[in-house]
Amino acid sequence: MKIKKKYCGHVIIVGKANVGKSTLLNNIIGKKISIVSRKKNTTQSNITGIKTEDNYQSIYIDTPGVVFDKNNNQMKHHKNNFYQTTQIATLIIFMIDRIDWTIHDEIILNEIKKTKIPILIIINKIDKISNKIILLPFINFLKKKIDFIEILPISAKKISNLILLKNIIKSYLPENCHIYPECYVTTNSDFFTVSEIIREQLILFLGDELPSIIKVEIESFKKKEKIALYIKAIIWVKNVRQKSIVIGHNGEKIKKISMISRNNIEKKFYIKTHLVLWVKDKN
């Protein structure tokens, strides 16, 4: 019996904040493993998604949106993580927002092309472009930048758009043993998953009021056989003013955040959950 060759590689998704990287990852994997919102810098750390189809395993890394210093247009915050992550890549997916090419896109491109790793560029959110004729001159503009392996105009929200993308990715995966079992869709720990579920509700409920430095820390995570899950989490903010914003009038906001977070945790883990949230300031 002939043994099938196996293929496996890392695919890094990069781009400015809020271009749709997390939406793309979730739709490729077929499950929500990365939180999505309109707020910039929703993704604060690398999210790994794994897609195994037959003898192909693609390991996707959704990186935090690249942030720039307003004064000098230099990359900041996640710069070191950006460089370290690209070192393991088989392929880089560079996402841009429609035909809005900026100096920041130019800087990101200049950095990733130094890696000599094949780059596929995605023009995302084309469903928001009413006059599709303007796409062609923009694609020609991109072709003059570097020799991209492909330039794909898509809407990351539409799964039907992703068939061609996944086929291109498969063609670039090297012959390798699979790193993860077929059932794996992410390397995220349960602690991380719970903290992200809570943080997603903070983003949705607080919107522009959300302190950018907010952090969710899982203090305890205990499972009583298969009966119930007991979680205590701390929401860290910078000062008393931010603390009052998160708690809300008479504690109404934090109650709603806690209730919906608990429901979403129960749906994720298929177990009754008891969730206690504390809001603390670092002063």
Swiss-Prot record:
Sequence segments annotated as region (G1): 15-22
UniProt record similarity statement: Belongs to the TRAFAC class TrmE-Era-EngA-EngB-Septin-like GTPase superfamily. Era GTPase family.
Location of the region described as G5 in the Swiss-Prot/TrEMBL record: 154-156
Gene designation per UniProt: era
Chain ranges of the KH type-2 domain: 198-283
Tagged with keyword Cytoplasm: yes
Chain residue ranges for the region called G3: 62-65
UniProt-listed Gene3D superfamilies: 3.30.300.20, P-loop containing nucleotide triphosphate hydrolases (3.40.50.300)
GO biological process: ribosomal small subunit assembly
InterPro entries the record matches: G_ERA_dom, GTP-bd, GTPase_Era-like, KH_dom-like_a/b, KH_dom_type_2, KH_sf_prok-type, P-loop_NTPase, Small_GTP-bd
Entry binding sites for GTP: 15-22, 62-66, 124-127
SUPFAM superfamilies for this protein: P-loop containing nucleoside triphosphate hydrolases, Prokaryotic type KH domain (KH-domain type II)
Entry-linked PANTHER family: GTPASE ERA, GTPASE ERA, MITOCHONDRIAL
Domain Era-type G intervals: 7-175
Keywords: Cell membrane, Cytoplasm, GTP-binding, Membrane, Nucleotide-binding, Ribosome biogenesis, RNA-binding, rRNA-binding
Residue segments, region G2: 41-45
Matching CDD domains: Era, KH-II_Era
Described function: An essential GTPase that binds both GDP and GTP, with rapid nucleotide exchange. Plays a role in 16S rRNA processing and 30S ribosomal subunit biogenesis and possibly also in cell cycle regulation and energy metabolism.
GO molecular function: GTP binding; GTPase activity; ribosomal small subunit binding; small ribosomal subunit rRNA binding
Quaternary organization: Monomer.
NCBIfam families: era (TIGR00436), PRK00089.1 (NF000908), small_GTP (TIGR00231)
Membrane topology reported for the UniProt record: Peripheral membrane protein
Protein name, UniProt field: GTPase Era
Source taxon at top rank: Bacteria
Species assigned in the record: Buchnera aphidicola subsp. Acyrthosiphon pisum (strain 5A)
Subcellular location as annotated: Cytoplasm; Cell membrane
A cellular component term, taken from the record's GO annotations: cytosol
Keyword Thylakoid included in the entry's annotation: no
